[in-house]
């Protein structure tokens, strides 16, 4: 695998740090008037999702991580594993609850997901940015009830709870941003 100096760090680069894969989120190269240049780097730990800030000298180098992102289709959950399929090879892959994390509530059948593999094992699953889900439970919106923030909680078909406008009713299909967990619009 390639080796990268700290001044080569760019957002999206995947590197090995302390024996684990990390993704660089931001990197600022600083060249002070006196002293050695350094890079201030914000990284996300791919195994747990935790964020780390670290300062590297300009002479420091790290190995690139052997991490692959695959576009796979979500098939089903058997209670223990979530199953995905590669649409080109029809090869199936299973991910455990640790790899899925909080994204389980955004997985719907036939959704195109990005599965990140490290050493051939799934370490994270990213659902599509926007999905359409049906509302299965919410309070009725009363006419003229606009006091407060103008939102109410709604339970979706996957079990996720999002805040929706007062006019949205049970049985309607809405579009949700999976990155923030927020209501986007009604689907016609």
From Swiss-Prot:
Q: Which SMART domains match?
A: EFP, Elong-fact-P_C
- What biological-process terms (Gene Ontology) are attached? peptide biosynthetic process
**Gene Ontology CC: one annotated term:** cytoplasm
User: Chief subcellular site?
Assistant: cytoplasm
Lineage: superkingdom:
Bacteria
Output the PTM entry. Answer: May be beta-lysylated on the epsilon-amino group of Lys-34 by the combined action of EpmA and EpmB, and then hydroxylated on the C5 position of the same residue by EpmC (if this protein is present). Lysylation is critical for the stimulatory effect of EF-P on peptide-bond formation. The lysylation moiety may extend toward the peptidyltransferase center and stabilize the terminal 3-CCA end of the tRNA. Hydroxylation of the C5 position on Lys-34 may allow additional potential stabilizing hydrogen-bond interactions with the P-tRNA.
Alphabetized InterPro entries for the sequence: Elong-fact-P_C, NA-bd_OB-fold, Rib_uL2_dom2, Transl_elong_fac_P/YeiP, Transl_elong_KOW-like, Transl_elong_P/YeiP_cen, Transl_elong_P/YeiP_CS, Transl_elongation_fac_P
Q: Which residues carry this modification: N6-(3,6-diaminohexanoyl)-5-hydroxylysine?
A: 34
NCBIfam families reported for this sequence: efp, PRK00529.1
Protein family: Belongs to the elongation factor P family.
Role this protein plays: Involved in peptide bond synthesis. Alleviates ribosome stalling that occurs when 3 or more consecutive Pro residues or the sequence PPG is present in a protein, possibly by augmenting the peptidyl transferase activity of the ribosome. Modification of Lys-34 is required for alleviation.
| Protein name (Swiss-Prot/TrEMBL) | Elongation factor P
The organism encoding this protein is Yersinia enterocolitica serotype O:8 / biotype 1B (strain NCTC 13174 / 8081)
Which gene is the coding source of this polypeptide chain?
A: efp
